A protein has these predicted regions:
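Amphipathic alpha-helical packing segments from all-alpha helical-bundle domains
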Residues: 69, 101, 115-143, 148-151, ...
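Basic, helix-initiating cap at the start of DNA-binding domains
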Residues: 1-41, 58-61
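Helix-turn-helix/winged-helix DNA-binding modules
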Residues: 30-31, 51, 145
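Hydrophobic alpha-helical connector segments
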Residues: 62, 73-101, 116-119
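C-terminal peripheral helix-coil segments that are non-catalytic and often amphipathic
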Residues: 1-3, 129, 133-141, 166-193
Length: 193
């Protein structure tokens, strides 16, 4: 059994830069982007790209998974710096941005699936874990309702993302996210008349 050696610092920077450029390029230009163009924009040679990602599908898959990891891994930093309800609202903005990127990469991701890959295998679990962490923090602080399931919130977020997918509707997405967060707050008991 072989173990992967950690990348040298320069190799890690090159890999990270390739992933960043790939997300932007595939999101903007779709599947027509050449790997040569990705390598050139990343400031590396095509051989460096192929050392990290032997196929186009490997690059697309890694870029998608990297974006998912960045989104989910941001939860701890958000909770460290913001009250839980604000951390959730900020994360929800990032989710909408993430789904916009994913849609832009749609054709490239379909090619990964057609070649036998499954870029979505870990998405649901990672997203559910991230949302559960945010909800539990807000519930513990008393700023979010205790009866909200992470899966339900993800469905709501996905619906908002689909309904406001164009950049022109991004402002509307923000307003809808505000409404969703307001619905997550604990209900105030009103004395009966």
């Amino acid at each position: 059994m072989t173990t992967e050696r950690p990348l040298r610092a320069d190799a890690r920077r090159n890999r990270d830069r390739l992933l960043e450029v790939a997300v932007r390029a595939f999101s903007h230009d779709g599947p027509d982007v050449t790997l040569e163009a990705v390598a050139k924009e990343a400031g590396v040679g095509i051989g460096t790209l192929y050392r990290h990602f032997p196929t186009r599908e490997a690059l697309v898959d890694a870029a998608y998974r990297n974006e998912l990891a960045r989104l989910c891994d941001s939860v701890a930093d958000l909770l460290a710096g913001l009250p839980p309800d604000r951390a959730l609202r900020t994360w929800m903005d990032r989710f909408v941005d993430y789904t916009t990127t994913k849609r832009g990469m749609g054709e490239a991701l379909r090619a990964v699936i057609a070649s036998g890959g499954d870029p979505f295998s870990e998405s649901r679990d990672r997203l559910t874990t991230a949302v559960t962490t945010l909800l539990r923090a807000g519930q513990a602080a008393g700023t979010l309702r205790a009866d909200v399931a992470a899966e339900d919130l993800l469905v709501g977020l996905s619906g908002i993302s689909l309904a406001t997918e164009s950049q022109e509707r991004r402002e509307q997405a923000g307003r809808l996210l505000d409404l969703l967060v307001d619905g997550l707050r604990p209900r105030i008991a009103h004395p009966s008349s």
